[in-house]
């Protein structure tokens, strides 16, 4: 996964990204990762954040072939309260996540959040320094 530090990447990944606001882009990336992990690890999930709301508010269950369930909707109103993603990953709790990193803050964040790292082609000296940070 990558945050998209260049315009050609960031703006095509999410319309909310802003090349002039890297702090916002970082929050967007972090929330995207949170949603992705929820989708992989929870049978049914919901999320309400700065950028995403799942499921969409006021969405009514209208699927006659599948019975409604209190696991994912309000049975009185038929409003969907949670959604699921299928198939779930085979790996538990989810596949290993690799993040492309370059700067010290990104390396530290990846390490603190249990992500593996992919580093651009640094010199051996720079690579040693990055490994120390991780």
Functional labels for PLM-detected ranges:
Residues 102-131:
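A conserved active-site cap/scaffold subdomain adjacent to cofactor or substrate pockets
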Residues 12, 129-134:
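Short low-complexity, flexible loop/linker segments enriched in glycine and/or proline
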Residues 1-113:
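Internal, glycine-rich beta/alpha segment that forms the wall or movable "lid"
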């Amino acid at each position: 996964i990558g945050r998209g530090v260049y315009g050609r990447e960031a703006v095509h990944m999410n319309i909310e990204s802003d090349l002039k606001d890297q702090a916002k882009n970082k929050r967007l990336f972090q929330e995207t990762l949170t949603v992705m992990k929820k989708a992989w690890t929870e049978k049914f999930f919901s999320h309400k954040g700065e950028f995403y709301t799942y499921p969409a508010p006021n969405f009514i269950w209208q699927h006659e072939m599948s019975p409604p369930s209190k696991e994912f909707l309000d049975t009185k109103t038929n409003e969907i309260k949670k959604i699921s993603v299928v198939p779930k990953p085979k790996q538990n709790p989810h596949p290993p996540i690799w993040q492309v990193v370059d700067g010290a803050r990104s390396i530290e964040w990846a390490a603190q959040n249990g992500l593996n790292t992919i580093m651009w082609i640094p010199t051996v000296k720079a690579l040693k320094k990055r490994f120390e940070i991780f």
